[in-house]
Amino acid sequence: MSIRSLVEAYNALDRLDLRVLRLLEAAHVRREYIPYGLVVRWAGRDEGAVGRSLSKLNRLGLIQRIKGPYEGFRLTFNAYDVLALHTLRKSGKLVSISPTPIGVGKESVVYSGEIPSGVKAAVKFHRTGTSSFIRARKARAFLARRRHLTKLYEARLSAHAEFAALSAVFDGGGLVPEPIAVNRHVVVMRYIEGVDARRIRPEDALPTARDVVETVEVALENGIIHGDLSPYNILVGDRAYVIDWPQWIPASSPNSVEALSRDIARLEEFFSGFNISIDKDRLINIIVNNKYKQIDFNNVYEKVLRSFIKT
């Protein structure tokens, strides 16, 4: 469903519709399909009103209905989009969103938007999970009991992981998009005007390399390794910004040196075309000599788990 269609669906919802969606979302932590009787009971409204709301939500493509031993309902991913947009709007984090995407990838879709201050924002919808935290023991255990939540949970975890990395690197002075808000599987950040590094002019190569290495160093000192750094993830405008952080890994991970080396190798390959070298040893020594902040590997996971339970 396009954002235009999502916004139209959202504008058609009333308070009861939103209440039913939130009830179904909360109930999904324990079961895939929620029986009709439970929805009516939890909604606290007469059966006719709840039934009409469910039919409306089904017609809008926000829920799926099954009929078998019992009549039940589950949310679609479109509903999570709507709920995230609703929460961001009601909390004053997002005013508007573009009808067409400005970036489409395998793991996410990005739209431009506007926050209440009038500042242009990038609104990133995570669609699949790329976070290394998905492989954490607690995450695997959570999903093993809730297979129906896998796609949503992984997208949500990736969004929160990216927001955590952006916050740490931005606060440390690194050149990344300023994080504004995260809700469910959606991250709102300040929009960066620029082009990816593959399109820079030769005279911009050296300042670009310096900015990127500086940001990599800030991230390392905060215990973070990008994990997928390449010219595709560098936006060059007034400065060079490193974007796309959901797959970051802690510097304390057993494979941290290997992951950092891969990032540096891709930078070396690109900047060698401009006769620019990267001081690989200095960056790796930050890990080897433990000159970084220790990150609790499960902290991001725990926040996402709590958000599921409290939804």
Regions found by a protein language model. Name each.
Residues 1-22, 49:
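Short alpha-helical segments that sit at the start of domains
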Residues 4-9, 48-51, 60, 64-66, ...:
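Conserved ATP-binding subdomain of kinase catalytic cores across diverse folds
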Residues 13-42:
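Short amphipathic alpha-helical interface segments
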Residues 33-47, 150-176, 197-232, 264, ...:
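Conserved kinase catalytic-core helix
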Residues 39, 50-61, 219:
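Basic amphipathic alpha-helical segments that dock to polyanions
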Residues 70-76:
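Minor-groove-contacting beta-hairpin "wing" of winged helix-turn-helix DNA-binding domains
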Residues 104, 108-115, 119-122, 211-247:
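Active-site acidic catalytic loop and adjacent metal/ATP-binding pocket
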Residues 220-226, 238-311:
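C-lobe/activation-segment region of protein kinase-like
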